[in-house]
Each structure stands twice: as C-alpha cells, then as structure tokens.
C-alpha cells in the first residue's frame, strides 16, 4: 500500500518515515490560529440548522417528554441540547445527570451546566476521556472544575477509549420516574 501511495504522490519510498506511534499533529491548531486573517485558506463555514421538531422559545423538557426528537450534529444546532442541560440543572424535578465527555472546548457550556446542576443539589456523574487527542489539557482542567463543584468524575477504563457522547437525565414527577437520553 505504501508503494501505491508513493506512486500516486510521485514520491520515492526513501522519503517515507515509519513510526509505531501516531504523529503529533497538535501544531496544526497553532497554524490555524496564526492564519485567522487569511480566510481564503479555510473552507466556508457551515451554519448548523435549527431543528424543526423543537420550539427553542419554549421549555424543552415538556417537548421532549411529549415526543422523541432526533438531532444530527453538526448539521443541526447543539444549542437545544445545551438549553436542555441548563433546564435540567434548574428543574427541581431533575435529581440526576449522568454523562460521558470526550472533547471539551476551552469555554465549555456543557461543563457550566453540569457545575450548575451539582451546585443545585443534583447528582452529577461524568465519565471523562482524558485521551482525547489534542484536548487532553482542556479535559484535565474541566475535570478538576467538575470535581470541585461536587460532581463524581470517572476517568475511563484502562485499555478502552470512550468516544461516545451519552447523557441520561433522571427526573421524578409525582410518583413517575422519567428519563431523557441523548445518544
């Protein structure tokens, strides 16, 4: 296969480096930051669409309890999910939020909502994947923030990499237990 790639790229195989470990491409983000004023070098930004299944001007929990909603990221906006987490953090009927986190942004609205939930007395359990390439430092810092707020933080399982983004919100309304799930 290496020969085929070399032929296609018109390279000699002596210019190929073999490595057992993945290449560290974190420098790419630094290049991106330095070239921000050269927008012609970047792909056109795609704007996420608002889901027609949700009215973001109304509380989301009742809408979701009424019918299932499918959101497809990044094509649809993540905003409804962030609003849902904020609603859950403030809803007196919500007693727990459990979530897996893979990549955390420098200004994570997800973590802000989880911290608010913990501060409001909700049981918050989070599995954080520390081996999220290029985001390890953010994940470590946010994990400390979550722990400081009283969240129970678990750091993955040896030999397995958690890449899924799951959320389970548990709510008790009267005698009924309700679950809202994000997969």
Regions found by a protein language model. Give the residues of each.
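N-terminal localization/anchoring segments of enzymes in phospholipid and broader phosphate metabolism
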Residues: 1-183
